[in-house]
Curated annotation (Swiss-Prot):
Belongs to the UPF0398 family. HAMAP family: UPF0398 (MF_01575). PANTHER family: UPF0398 PROTEIN SPR0331, UPF0398 PROTEIN YPSA. Signal peptide: none annotated. InterPro entries: YspA (IPR010697). This is UPF0398 protein SUB1405. It comes from Streptococcus uberis (strain ATCC BAA-854 / 0140J). Pfam families: YpsA.
Amino acid sequence: MTAILVTGYKSFELGLFSDKDPRIKVIKAAIQKDMVKMIEEGVDWFILTGNLGFEYWALEVLKDLKKAYPISVATIFAFENHGENWNESNLEKLAAFKTVDFVKYSYPQYENPSQFKSYHEFLMANTEGAYLFYDSENETNLKYLVMKMKELPQYRIHYLTFDRLNEIYEEGNDF
């Protein structure tokens, strides 16, 4: 079994506020290409954390890929009350994260910052690598997790970058 943590930018961090934004199709095309390659290399578990944006788009791609490949998807939320204040549209997306093969919560609710450290350590200890949509030139809070991942010599990180998205777009696929 090979498990990969999937995480990256949230939609608002990318300035994507509509599900109909054409850039999302390019992102999903890149996700699909990358994930098929990972599956062919032996990845059979994809671990999500329930965030909107990249993770949700990855979830949509994974649900399609499950029809053709023997893969499993897990959502491991940091807190049971994750997303409880989201609007109705986002709550529907949250519900989709709860329809995967395995769902777990690390903590009932947020109490202190050390919970995030323990949560991230757990995610890294239970995955062999990560698939990240992240660029160090466009930092977010994800930078702390990325720094910890880089400290682990055997932890493989596959990045989806803005340059890669441009390549996918220029390939001229029908989006």
